[in-house]
């Protein structure tokens, strides 16, 4: 087994590389004699490998494809993704050859973020197994797998005014709102680097030797059943926030969030956190502040200082008795505190899983990517939260959502029961004989038999 060498290809944007590394660390721990070479940009690797790691995980830097002196303009992250993909396959193949020479071990398996769609071609050229990781929900993978079917049934670029139309032909989905499909399926720029990447991925991922997913089977039974029938070894091995929780020793609470929560009533606090890549525009920040003030809802808000200037004048002073704004919060600890009654977020997949793990209902304000689809599932399928009225924060819409989720009435009870049920299912899935634990064992076996 000491000759096994897994090439791991990371997607170096947002939280993707960290999620892939978390799974690799679990595999490296289970397979101490297998070498895992983690191919990633130097910038991403340097942020991930800050503490000692397993001896059998070897970080290997590759180029990000950005020309010297390049200035990020209006294209933003999309442009950087395009530059990365332009040379990624060649850069990775060269790096893999160097890693093989350095280690004296040929590649026996290619593991990758599913966004690295060409990793399947690399595995095929090497005649080894290919294991792409899908870091989001089974449902969002499904719509990319069925993009051609959706485009056949829905005229591309023709959805304006039809956003509320209900689709019933996508396998695994009883119903799906047309406007809840991710951008790039039938709306938005279908030729952008990101849209093209997702389309290619959806068309090629069926060739995978195994397809691990950052979710648990009990969350999406009909979708999982359909995808299991389409793929070899479709393996839900998450939620990663439960299987690979961050080491508590590294978590600080420099702003005293937990001590502040200790003084609040049980289930009364709205925790607001939009992650690292999505912040509402100024008018929505102002509307949220007005709603919190008028409703006198206790709140803990994780927000960078530079955004505070958009609040109504005097807001911080007037709400100081029941509100706290910090530039960073220990989110997992905050959500698991008994005083928190709702999590207001962008409906990114990591945030949804953290809500489920903590048993805290959600108010969603989706922005891009899979956010709209996640919001649909949260509100209409799992019934563990609500999407903000109209999809953007207004004062009245925010007050309505807060009232729906925090009021001690039938709706609040139903939300808490639903998310409590999914919390229990998630914990059982990652338990000793749970579905995710059993799927992980299968993945371990596949790693050592896929060359």
Swiss-Prot record:
InterPro entries associated with the record: UDP_glucos_trans
Gene3D superfamilies, per the entry: Glycogen Phosphorylase B
SUPFAM superfamilies according to UniProt: UDP-Glycosyltransferase/glycogen phosphorylase
Similarity section: Belongs to the UDP-glycosyltransferase family.
GO molecular function, one term: quercetin 3-O-glucosyltransferase activity
UniProt key word Metal-binding: no
Thermal dependence of catalysis: Optimum temperature is 50 degrees Celsius.
Protein's job: Involved in the formation of flavonol glycosides required for pollen germination. Shows a strict specificity for UDP-galactose and flavonols as substrates. Acts on kaempferol, quercetin, galangin, iso-rhamnetin, kaempferide, rhamnetin, morin, myricetin and fisetin.
Signal peptide limits: 1-30
Species of the source: Petunia hybrida (Petunia)
pH dependence: Optimum pH is 7.5 in the forward direction and 6.0 in the reverse direction.
Catalytic activity annotation: kaempferol + UDP-alpha-D-galactose = kaempferol 3-O-beta-D-galactoside + UDP + H(+)
Pfam annotation, one family: UDPGT
Positions of the catalytic residues: 16, 113
Keywords: Glycosyltransferase, Signal, Transferase
Listed name of the protein: Kaempferol 3-O-beta-D-galactosyltransferase
Phylogenetic placement of the source organism: Eukaryota, Viridiplantae, Streptophyta, Embryophyta, Tracheophyta
Subunit structure: Monomer.
Domain of life of the organism encoding this protein: Eukaryota
E.C. designation(s): 2.4.1.234
Binding site for an anthocyanidin: 16, 144, 369
